[in-house]
């Protein structure tokens, strides 16, 4: 809800994707699904270590070319390939380059996303620091776990009074 009490059905939904692991489940959606996302790619300037991909699969043409390369190169090539696929599909993306991965750079990245969330809240006229939609779940969780504080009584009563699950609809 906006500060004026009007529905606001837009905003960020952070999701993570790990290279090729998530390409089939997410990249297809991002390139051919609804045009309602901005993708942020994270690039690492210097990895802590280098892992070489060994030779030894020459009989398998589809992977033989990887021998002698590093996992670092593979990760960066996957990022570039994803960036290219998004560009070719006309989808917005941004790349944030971390000089290295450590507590400091991860903290800076998290702070950056916190600031962008607060800024987006202002642009959409919503209070990014008040999440009433989350409170319902928290009250229900505390009630389920047996918190006897009176402020959870309503949630407990409402939940115990709801219709029973129908076994024929449960897989």
Which residue stretches match the model-derived regions?
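A SIS-like phosphosugar-recognition module
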Residues: 1-171
């Amino acid at each position: 809800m906006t500060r004026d009490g009007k529905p606001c059905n837009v905003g960020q939904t952070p999701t993570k994707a790990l290279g090729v692991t998530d390409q089939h489940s997410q990249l297809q959606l991002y390139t051919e699904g609804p045009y309602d996302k901005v993708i942020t790619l994270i690039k690492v300037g210097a990895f802590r270590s280098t892992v070489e991909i060994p030779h030894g699969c020459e009989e398998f043409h589809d992977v033989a070319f990887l021998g002698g390369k590093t996992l670092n190169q593979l990760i960066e090539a996957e990022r570039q390939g994803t960036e290219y696929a998004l560009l070719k599909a006309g989808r917005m993306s941004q790349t944030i380059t971390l000089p290295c991965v450590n507590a400091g750079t991860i903290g800076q990245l998290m702070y950056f996303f916190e600031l962008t969330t607060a800024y987006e809240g202002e642009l959409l006229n919503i209070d990014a620091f008040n999440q009433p939609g989350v409170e319902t779940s928290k009250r229900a969780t505390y009630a389920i776990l047996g918190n006897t504080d009176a402020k959870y009584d309503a949630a407990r009563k409402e939940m115990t009074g709801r219709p029973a699950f129908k076994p024929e609809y449960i897989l």
